[in-house]
Amino acid sequence: AYAEPLTVEDDEFSAAYAVMDDPTDESEHIYGTTYGARKALCEQEVTKVFGDKAINIRPGIITGTGDPTERFRHWLRRMVVGNEILVPGQDDLPVQYIDAADMCGWMVRLLEEGSASGPYNAVGAAEPYRARPLLEGLRDSTGSTSTLTWIPWDWIRKATTETPNYGPWYGSGPMPLMQVNNDRAIAAGLTFRPIAETAKDMIAKLDQVPVRDGRRGGFSAETEASLLEKWHAEQG
């Protein structure tokens, strides 16, 4: 629901709403144009009806056992397969995920308690994860023997024309979208299970949830192998 550019200093009340030139436009969602703006319009309608009793939850990247996207599941799938895994970008990249079970349980508690109101950024965890410790922790917790090879995006874009599906792992540097302030939600009781627990639950159901649009995460196996070979050859 936020307008760009979002900064890491922004909270629920300082960040600007995304807006649409024509609120009645019902054309296809366009991320960065109409998607967030429509969320903002929904919040405004809820607030009109419920006033100061309105609760508007603003999730970040949601994952969990029913997640049909590859924004988190890709890494688990690759670790189950094993072998060397290409990881794009910076190894200290901040990333935020929240387990749907944590978010939904908290939302139910807010309604039961009846004292909450206003907007809340439902993003996890208490502090943003960092890419390398997150993936290494997932690998170790799953018992995978995979190795992780970090390759800069600038090099990748020069080496291939294939457009991969890496979800929030795009870009050459940290993204404010992955560093959203969640202080208000935590103060209102939002808690987070260990990411390893989320991973364990998801791995048990990897093949039971169809991938959205049938598009697997990352590069094709052939491209990933080719890029890794080229990278190692250049690095000596």
PLM segments and residue spans:
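A short C-terminal helix-loop "cap" of Rossmann-like NAD(P)-dependent dehydrogenase/epimerase domains
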Residues: 76-88, 144-145, 177
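Conserved Rossmann-fold NAD(P)-dependent oxidoreductase catalytic core, especially the SDR/UDP-sugar
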Residues: 1-40, 48, 55
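Substrate-positioning beta->alpha
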Residues: 69-75, 88-111, 117-121, 197
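Short, solvent-exposed loop/turn segments at secondary-structure junctions
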Residues: 1, 61-63, 92-93, 127-128
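Conserved beta-loop-beta element that borders a ligand/cofactor-binding pocket
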Residues: 40-66
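Mid/C-terminal beta-alpha module of Rossmann-like enzyme folds, strongest
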Residues: 109-173, 181-183, 201-203, 209-236
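Residue-level signal for the nucleotide or nucleotide-sugar donor/cofactor binding architecture
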Residues: 67, 98, 129, 180, ...
